[in-house]
From Swiss-Prot:
UniProt GO cellular component terms: cytosol
Subcellular location: Cytoplasm
Lineage of the species this protein comes from: Bacteria, Bacillati, Bacillota, Clostridia, Lachnospirales
Functional note: A translational regulator that binds mRNA to regulate translation initiation and/or mRNA stability. Usually binds in the 5'-UTR at or near the Shine-Dalgarno sequence preventing ribosome-binding, thus repressing translation. Its main target seems to be the major flagellin gene, while its function is anatagonized by FliW.
Keywords attached to this entry: Bacterial flagellum biogenesis, Cytoplasm, Repressor, RNA-binding, Translation regulation
Gene expressing this chain: csrA
InterPro entries the record matches: CsrA (IPR003751), CsrA_sf (IPR036107)
Name under which the protein is recorded: Translational regulator CsrA
Amino acid sequence: MLALSRKKDEAIIINDDIEITIIEIKGDQVKLGISAPKSVPIYRKEVYAQILDSNKEAASSVDVKTLNQLFKK
């Protein structure tokens, strides 16, 4: 993992098209601004974990026989 120090209004660039800027620092919270192409999904880590869990749950509840019947049509 790369660890960088930044101050308010400073930024980092990732892959020429993603810019992360430090907008505000209050105590132990840091507010980030992220500029990226619309094709790049951006999630908070805890939200992304919930999405993955939901996808796994949805995939595991599908009956294989039902899927096979759908694809035969």
